[in-house]
């Protein structure tokens, strides 16, 4: 970069300043306009070609075409002839086509690829349409049957694992829900029928503990204290004892 800048400065010192300024302005404008394109213009080479210090190449030609295209509106305002305007338009269009050629080629390649892929997909769909639907349905049915067989086998394996884990405990002592259903079906006297809610609520707790305590003719804590701690409540004492104490 430093060597190129020194060369540019030397060239500017040798040639007249007006021509150098014009070439630099034109090339800088072209470089700014084409910096986002696929082939940006190098302002140094363009200015050297403009000043005839380097043999002309594509840089200066494309820049000149751009400049003619950009100065078309200004030339129309100044009142130039239509022929000159047409020439400027043609030059600008040629420069644009030169710059846009690689982009157009890439777009055409992409369109060709998409068309080829669409044709391949159509061919595949036509092949599948000619007798492949029945095969697909058959494979689906086979997969469903295999899945059902796998679930049955899995359930059998689970039962075997449970039997091994509990040592046949489930076989000897079935679940309480099955016992309850059997009791309700067998019960004719009304003893076991209707207790399912209680068993669900307490989890069989009522069956395991001692029978229901009879609290007949007992007040709030009288029977409990008498049974557990052998405490006589005041309500069970003889009222005559209080009358004797008062008489004394």
From Swiss-Prot:
Keyword entries, A-Z: Cleavage on pair of basic residues, Disulfide bond, Endorphin, Neuropeptide, Neurotransmitter, Opioid peptide, Secreted, Signal
Organism, scientific name: Rattus norvegicus (Rat)
PTM description: The N-terminal domain contains 6 conserved cysteines thought to be involved in disulfide bonding and/or processing.
Pfam families in the cross-refs: Opiods_neuropep
Record bears the keyword Transmembrane helix: no
PROSITE patterns: OPIOIDS_PRECURSOR (PS01252)
Name assigned to this protein: Proenkephalin-B
Listed GO biological process terms: chemical synaptic transmission; neuropeptide signaling pathway; response to immobilization stress; response to nicotine; sensory perception
């Amino acid at each position: 970069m430093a060597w190129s800048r020194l060369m540019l400065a030397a060239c500017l010192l040798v040639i007249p300043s007006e021509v150098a300024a014009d070439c630099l302005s034109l090339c800088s404008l072209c470089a700014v306009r084409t910096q986002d394109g696929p082939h940006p213009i190098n302002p140094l080479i363009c200015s050297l070609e403009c000043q005839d210090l380097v043999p002309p190449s594509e840089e200066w030609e494309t820049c000149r075409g751009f400049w003619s295209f950009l100065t078309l509106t200004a030339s129309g305002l100044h009142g130039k002839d239509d022929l000159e305007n047409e020439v400027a338009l043609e030059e600008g269009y040629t420069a644009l086509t030169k710059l846009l050629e690689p982009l157009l080629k890439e777009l055409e390649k992409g369109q060709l690829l998409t068309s080829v892929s669409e044709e391949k997909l159509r061919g595949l769909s036509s092949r599948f349409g000619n007798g492949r639907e029945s095969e697909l349905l058959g494979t689906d049915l086979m997969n469903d049957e295999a899945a059902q067989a796998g679930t049955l086998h899995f359930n059998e394996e689970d039962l075997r694992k449970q039997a091994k884990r509990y040592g046949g405990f489930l076989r000897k002592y079935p679940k309480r829900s099955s016992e309850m259903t059997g009791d309700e079906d067998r019960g004719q006297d009304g003893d076991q029928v209707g207790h399912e809610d209680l068993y669900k609520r307490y989890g069989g707790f009522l069956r395991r503990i001692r029978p229901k305590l009879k609290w007949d003719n007992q007040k709030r804590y009288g029977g409990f204290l008498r049974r557990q701690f052998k405490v006589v409540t005041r309500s069970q004492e003889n009222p005559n004892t209080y009358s004797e104490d008062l008489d004394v």
